């Protein structure tokens, strides 16, 4: 569910994995792993994602 929402929101906002990685201070590979469901971001990164996409947690 998280991975699907992340992909959908990123595409809706027309951002690349690189764009999100730069805003969060992580690697593009980290974003790719989140979108693949291999790992999930910590709470601080989730809060930052919510701010970027203007959604609530």
Where are these regions (language model features)?
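Short basic helix-loop element that most often maps to the first helix and adjoining turn
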Residues: 4-19, 23
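Short, Lys/Arg-enriched C-terminal cap helix and immediately downstream tail that follows
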Residues: 7, 43-44
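Recognition helix of helix-turn-helix/homeodomain-like DNA-binding domains
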Residues: 26-40
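DNA major-groove recognition helix of helix-turn-helix/homeodomain DNA-binding modules
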Residues: 44-57
